[in-house]
């Protein structure tokens, strides 16, 4: 069963509203994790064993694979982009993006992986999010998340 695009897109403004307000952090994480769990139930997400399968299963959770293309697989990492226009785009609110992407981190937990946003649409001039996925048991210490990089004042990914 496909998640209807209209339903998926209706969730985005609610997610942005919560994630844009740091004082709502107590509610944002459970909300995003709950929405991800609901998506996983509707789409019948299954744990995967290889990093390629993890990337493909993450893609399958969206209304269209075209909006979340896998751009490459290197060693233990799947790279992908998120082409859905984010309301955080260009705002500089990379922390809000991080809170909102709890949705994807929860999905990756359920399918056996980890999720890191490398570049966020919230950063000035960035039009697509660049993300990385690895199996749950593979360290991600070498991947610098966008919100950490932005906090350091470095807007160029490593």
Residue ranges and their predicted role:
Residues 1-79, 83-103, 114-158:
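N-terminal accessory segment detector
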